[in-house]
């Protein structure tokens, strides 16, 4: 019914504005096929394969990281039936869905613990650790990514209080140290993936910030946006 109304209304508007009799007749005669095509689109999948000719391998608008055919076939076999997603087959009892990847991620990265979410990792981290407290972040790293996601907005939504420090082009480790107070819940660093500040610049390395955090017993949160555990430089990628 919606398709009938939409296509009919579109035809009425065209007839009211156009003086092209031939086109009016053509559109009137094709009204029923147009309605059928519009209705068919409602039940057709929207996602379609495309060719990435942008030069950007991990394209945020084109699906980001790809899954190999081998792993895609394995996933198809899993998601098209029942699985042990939250069931411990050895114990014969309820399990944790995170157990399938946590140990592997810890082994690969050397982390003490690991968690995976499908989105909003930074906001979830800030909300869990920093709600109501202060989080210093460099003024030169207050990024905005596609979709109008801004660091200040994410901080506010999480309940954390953002403390911007340094200047647009230079931030020193001492800026972070001076910003620490009794209300500080974490130190933050954001990867500027979609722009660069060049020239008379200075920034704090993740290692230096982590050392400061350890010395003050304050967690350090680094928002990488995306990353890779394998060095792709030999392949000409950066």
Where are these regions (language model features)?
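Short glycine-rich or small-residue beta-strand-to-loop segments that form or flank ligand, phosphate
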Residues: 57-61, 88, 136-138
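Asparagine-centered polar/low-complexity signal
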Residues: 52, 61, 84, 118-120, ...
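Catalytic, metal-anchored helix/loop core of enzyme active sites in primary metabolism
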Residues: 34-36, 59, 90
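N-terminal Rossmann-like NAD(P)+-binding subdomain of aldehyde/semialdehyde dehydrogenases
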Residues: 15-25, 44-66
């Amino acid at each position: 019914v919606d398709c009938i109304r939409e296509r009919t209304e579109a035809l009425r508007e065209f007839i009211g504005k156009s003086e092209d009799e031939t086109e009016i007749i053509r559109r009137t005669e094709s009204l029923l096929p147009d309605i059928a095509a519009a209705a068919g689109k409602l039940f057709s999948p929207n996602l379609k394969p495309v060719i990435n000719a942008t030069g950007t391998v991990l394209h945020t608008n084109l699906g980001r990281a790809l899954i190999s055919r081998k792993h895609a076939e394995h996933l198809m076999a899993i998601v098209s039936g029942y699985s042990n997603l939250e069931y411990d087959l050895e114990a014969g009892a309820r399990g944790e869905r995170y157990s399938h990847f946590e140990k592997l991620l810890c082994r690969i990265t050397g982390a003490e613990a690991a968690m995976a979410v499908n989105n909003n990792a930074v906001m979830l981290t800030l909300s869990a650790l920093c709600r109501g407290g202060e989080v210093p972040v460099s003024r030169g790293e207050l990024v905005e990514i596609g979709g109008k996601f801004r660091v200040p907005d994410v901080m506010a939504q999480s309940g954390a209080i953002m403390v911007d420090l340094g200047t647009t082009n230079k931030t020193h480790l001492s800026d972070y140290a001076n910003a620490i107070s009794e209300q500080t819940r974490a130190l933050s660093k954001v990867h500027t993936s979609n722009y660069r500040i060049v020239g008379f610049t200075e920034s704090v390395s993740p290692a230096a910030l982590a050392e400061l955090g350890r010395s003050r017993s304050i967690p350090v949160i680094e928002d990488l946006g995306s990353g890779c555990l394998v060095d792709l430089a030999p392949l000409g990628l950066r």
